[in-house]
Structures are given as structure tokens and as C-alpha cells.
């Protein structure tokens, strides 16, 4: 079943229009009770939720501007955050692929991790250079 959800996240990653420094394609899906309830991918579009959580990624005293391009995980969070469900039973699957088509580390950044934890999500599965990993949040 896990491979099915990673394949769904992979399909989402192909929609990515992000062309930043890494230009990696990232897709994510949220799964609740065996069903995909939301999909997302990284994009050039900004989002206020990403902007709010970016304080976890960057020095807030810095004068540098970091555009709040939405990450795949944050797009998923924005789609499910108002649902009336037990978020501790939601699993997020994140897939990342380089522009060359090889698997890459897709561990959520500090901003996305904070958003997932704030929502009460406890389990995140993501790609690594060598396969897949599951991480449990406290």
C-alpha cells in the first residue's frame, strides 16, 4: 500500500513548476484511513501559510527577503487543516526527484515540519537518495 501512496506523490511531483536553485520536483499526499485526502506539489506560487511558517527556516532578524513559494507539504496542509478529523491518524507521503530523474531527500523542511506538527500529524514518509524513510513526530 505504501508504494501506491508514494506513486501518487510522484505523480503530483510531475506537476511542479518550481525552477529554483535545486529545481527538484516535489509532490506530497495526505492519507487518512487508507484514502488520499489531499495532494500537493511545490510551485512558484506564493502562499500566506508558507510565509507564516518560513520563520522556522530563516533568521527572522535578517534583512533578506525569502519568497514564500509553497512547498508540496504546505499545500497539503492548506487543503486539510479545516477538516474535522483526527490528524494523528494522517500520514504524509513526500516524493522528491532531481531534474535528472533520480530519487532525492524529501524530508520536510523546518517550516513544513512545524506546520505538520501544529496540525497534529505524527507520521511522515519521504524519499531519500537510497529509497524511503518513515519518521514519527512526538
Positions of predicted regions on the chain:
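Zinc-dependent deaminase catalytic domain
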Residues: 1-138
Amino acid at each position: 500500500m505504501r508504494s501506491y501512496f508514494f506513486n501518487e506523490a510522484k505523480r503530483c511531483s510531475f506537476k511542479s513548476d518550481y525552477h529554483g536553485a535545486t529545481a527538484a520536483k516535489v509532490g506530497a499526499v495526505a492519507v487518512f484511513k487508507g484514502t488520499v485526502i489531499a495532494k500537493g506539489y511545490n510551485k512558484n506560487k506564493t502562499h500566506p501559510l508558507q510565509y507564516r511558517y518560513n520563520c522556522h527556516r530563516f533568521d527572522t532578524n535578517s534583512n533578506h527577503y525569502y519568497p514564500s513559494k509553497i512547498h508540496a507539504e504546505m499545500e497539503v496542509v492548506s487543503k486539510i487543516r479545516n477538516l474535522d478529523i483526527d490528524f494523528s491518524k494522517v500520514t504524509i507521503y513526500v516524493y522528491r526527484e532531481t531534474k535528472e530523474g533520480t530519487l532525492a531527500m524529501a524530508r520536510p523542511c523546518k517550516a513544513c515540519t512545524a506546520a505538520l506538527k501544529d496540525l497534529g500529524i505524527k507520521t511522515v514518509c519521504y524519499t531519500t537518495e537510497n529509497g524511503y524513510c518513515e519518521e514519527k513526530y512526538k
